[in-house]
């Protein structure tokens, strides 16, 4: 870390402290854990390849893992709200049982706040610098997320008012997490 500090100070003297304060954690602190907990599997090869590429790139910045949970089967074509709620509650319990202790939950949901890549970067940096750096991003099933998961969330995040397949949402979110990490590191990828 000392070598990195020297290099940053040499090449970016005026910005070095900002970058170091924003991204780098205390020297003794471990790498930030970022989890992506998803209900359902990636079926399309091209989505899986895209996610795998960003997952590989993220290894330079954080301990990043993806946890896939099974989607509850709903038999009825026009299922009642009670049937959907029961399925969401079961998925919600599985999601919450996979969140690391002390991790901030980021619930991906339509009613969430729309934030920029810079704001996401700042959220991750703030978590890392607070000493409680673990973050768990959560993408629910096609029916959404349980109320319990949404209530537990430190941030409810929306990718906008558009509707997209959850497999695509996973790829976009993984890219945005990578982009946020590059912003925090002062890299040029995000420009």
Please state what every model-predicted region is.
Residues 70-135:
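S-adenosyl-L-methionine/SAH cofactor-binding core of RNA-modifying enzymes
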Residues 62, 102-103, 153:
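Short, well-ordered alpha-helix to beta-strand connector turns
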């Amino acid at each position: 870390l000392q070598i990195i500090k020297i290099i940053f100070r040499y090449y970016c003297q005026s910005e070095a402290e900002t970058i170091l304060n924003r991204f780098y954690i205390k020297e003794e602190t471990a790498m930030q854990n970022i989890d992506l907990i998803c209900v359902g599997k990636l079926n399309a090869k091209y989505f899986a390849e895209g996610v795998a590429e960003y997952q590989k790139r993220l290894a330079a910045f954080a301990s990043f893992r993806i946890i896939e949970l099974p989607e509850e089967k709903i038999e009825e074509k026009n299922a009642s709200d009670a049937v959907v709620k029961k399925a969401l509650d079961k998925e919600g319990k599985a999601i919450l049982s996979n969140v690391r202790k002390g991790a901030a939950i980021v619930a991906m949901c339509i009613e969430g706040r729309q934030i920029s890549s810079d704001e996401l970067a700042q959220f991750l940096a703030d978590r890392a610098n607070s000493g409680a750096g673990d973050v768990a991003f959560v993408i629910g099933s096609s029916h959404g997320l349980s109320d319990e998961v949404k209530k537990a969330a430190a941030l409810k995040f929306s990718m906008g008012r558009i509707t997209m397949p959850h497999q695509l949402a996973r790829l976009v979110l993984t890219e945005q997490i990578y982009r946020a990490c590059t912003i925090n590191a002062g890299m040029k990828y995000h420009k």
